[in-house]
């Protein structure tokens, strides 16, 4: 009985350890800018149909790759754990 409790406790700690490693590694990956494929339209300035299309494709890639929110303005596309609304 004691060995079963010990094994279960060990499994819990090991799973927590790996969850922390995965969370930390993905949080570092998630804050970096993603490489935007050349097929995406890179536009500057105010929101237009082209920049809205770019941000839509950017956010789709961001969620597909990291499951993170996206900050997109003009030609800047960044996946992060939070969205900075600094308008």
Swiss-Prot record:
Coiled coil: none
Signal sequence region: 1-34
Keyword Nucleotide-binding (UniProt): no
Subcellular location: Secreted
Intrachain disulfide bonds: 55-72, 58-77, 62-79
Entry GO terms, CC: extracellular region
GO BP terms in the entry: defense response to fungus; killing of cells of another organism
Keywords from the named record: Antimicrobial, Disulfide bond, Fungicide, Plant defense, Secreted, Signal
Superkingdom of source: Eukaryota
Family: Belongs to the DEFL family.
Protein name, UniProt field: Defensin-like protein 223
Originating organism: Arabidopsis thaliana
């Amino acid at each position: 009985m004691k060995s079963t409790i010990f094994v279960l406790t060990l499994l819990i700690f090991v799973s927590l350890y790996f969850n922390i490693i995965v969370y930390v590694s993905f949080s570092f990956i998630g804050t970096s800018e993603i490489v935007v494929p050349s097929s995406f339209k890179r536009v500057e300035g105010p929101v237009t149909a082209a920049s809205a299309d770019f941000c839509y494709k950017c956010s789709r890639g961001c969620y597909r790759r990291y499951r993170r929110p996206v900050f997109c303005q003009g030609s800047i596309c960044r996946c992060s754990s939070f969205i900075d609304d600094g308008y």
